[in-house]
């Protein structure tokens, strides 16, 4: 029960409710984008360092409204799924925002997947439109698509008819070349149909915060990946509260984590949106040298990464000796830091503070987090304090709450708990109790 380290040892039961100070917010992704663009119009929202692209919040809003309008013109309707099968780049970010603005559900798909894994994901959630890159490392995405959807070569763009993938109607590729049966992503970033754009603006009040916004696939360590459905309410609130603890407001974030993962979305993408921070994508996939150069060139103040990423970052910095002067905070999750790694993060990367986050896909992302004033012992040996407005308990095999300090299964209840696993009622019932306690296993 090391996550309960802050609770008084006088507590008899390992149940805790973190009441919190700030209120929960009832907003959609689109409403949050509109609000941030209004409050910080000229602040940079996202910089894709490796692509040489950058957008302010006002320009993101403008482009996203047009992209959302074009999604609807393709025949997509509220609740339809838009798959994103791509590495970290600008079109990933814009697609997620555009889907949210149009009342659609974005689906992050691991860019390293091969044809069978991609096919499983597309079928599992019934993806209607797929946005993808041209290539990533050794991956040639059009060739992968041809294997599972051979009709693409002879289809009219936006009107795909696939026997194997009957739900898939549109493939959109971020490419300069025109590929048979596919739309070009850049063509969807402009829309001369002002009525269509106005329709997107008008529909914002009809999209509820409780409606699905994003689907995350679990890692699938015990079978096929499950499709975790997250709402706008899940995402905006989890991002707001983890961003607040990370002091994200006005920061410039170096984001090394993959965007298809819950960490990349909640702790980075929407946290930056909620707090008016700038997000920097150093490379399409993790590259320590690109990260270091982006940190220096873009004056990043916060670095996000897993412990293994920090190990590689430190090794490369010892070699390059770049002048890291602006970075102050390192945020890590996925595994505990060793004392040696914590010391090197501070000494070699010249950071003042290191923070731990702990969570899981079914909980939107983060549910425990260390505080800015935590000492080294808490950073190394705990995952910090429970998030505001959440409940936690530890239970035994019979479902009884164990005494404080005793081992057992962690359960969480509150705003960040997923809606359900899509098309998987049995697994949902296994994981979510009738009282909405999520069993972490």
Language-model region placement:
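Conserved AMP-binding/adenylation subdomain of ANL enzymes
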Residues: 235-252, 260-302, 312, 316
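Structural core segment of the AMP-binding/adenylate-forming
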Residues: 1-2, 104-190
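Flexible, low-complexity linker/hinge segments
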Residues: 18-27, 179-212
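Conserved ATP-binding/catalytic segment of the ANL
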Residues: 74, 85, 400-405, 409-441
């Amino acid at each position: 029960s090391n996550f309960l380290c802050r609770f008084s040892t006088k507590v008899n039961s390992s149940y805790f409710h973190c009441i919190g100070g700030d209120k929960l917010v009832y907003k959609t992704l689109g409403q949050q984008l509109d609000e941030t663009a209004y409050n910080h119009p000229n602040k940079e929202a996202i910089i894709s360092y490796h692509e040489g692209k950058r957008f302010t919040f006002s320009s993101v809003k403008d482009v996203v409204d047009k992209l959302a309008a074009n999604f609807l013109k393709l025949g997509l309707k509220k609740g339809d799924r838009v798959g994103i099968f791509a590495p970290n780049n600008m079109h990933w970010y814009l697609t997620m925002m555009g889907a949210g603005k149009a009342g659609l559900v974005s689906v992050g798909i691991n860019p390293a997947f091969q044809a069978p894994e991609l096919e499983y994901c597309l079928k599992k959630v019934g993806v209607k439109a797929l946005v993808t890159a041209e290539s990533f490392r050794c991956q040639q995405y059009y060739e992968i698509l041809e294997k599972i959807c051979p009709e693409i070569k002879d289809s009219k763009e936006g009107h795909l008819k696939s026997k194997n993938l009957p739900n898939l109607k549109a493939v959109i590729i971020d490419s300069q070349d025109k590929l048979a049966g596919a739309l070009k992503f850049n063509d969807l970033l402009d829309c001369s149909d002002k009525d269509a754009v106005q329709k997107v603006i008008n529909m914002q009040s009809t999209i509820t915060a409780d409606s699905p916004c994003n689907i995350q696939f679990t890692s699938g360590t015990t079978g096929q990946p499950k499709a975790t459905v997250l709402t706008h309410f899940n995402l905006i609130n989890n991002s707001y509260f983890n961003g607040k603890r990370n002091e994200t407001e006005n920061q410039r974030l170096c984001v090394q984590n993959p965007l298809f993962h819950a960490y990349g979305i909640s702790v980075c993408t929407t946290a930056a949106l909620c707090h008016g921070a700038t997000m920097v994508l150093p490379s399409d996939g993790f590259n320590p040298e690109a990260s270091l150069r982006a940190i220096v060139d873009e004056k990043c103040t916060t670095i996000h990464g897993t412990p293994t990423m920090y190990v590689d970052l430190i090794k490369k910095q010892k070699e390059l000796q770049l002048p890291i002067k602006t970075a102050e905070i390192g945020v890590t999750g996925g595994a505990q830091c060793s004392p040696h790694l914590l010391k090197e993060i501070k000494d070699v990367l010249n950071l003042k503070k290191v923070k731990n986050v702990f969570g899981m896909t079914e909980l939107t992302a983060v549910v425990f987090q260390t505080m800015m004033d935590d000492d080294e012992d808490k950073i190394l040996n705990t995952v910090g304090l429970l998030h505001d407005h959440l409940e936690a308990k530890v239970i035994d095999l019979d479902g009884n709450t164990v005494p404080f300090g005793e081992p057992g299964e962690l359960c969480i209840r509150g705003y960040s708990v997923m809606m359900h696993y899509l098309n998987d009622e049995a697994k949902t019932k296994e994981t979510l109790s009738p009282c909405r306690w999520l069993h972490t296993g």
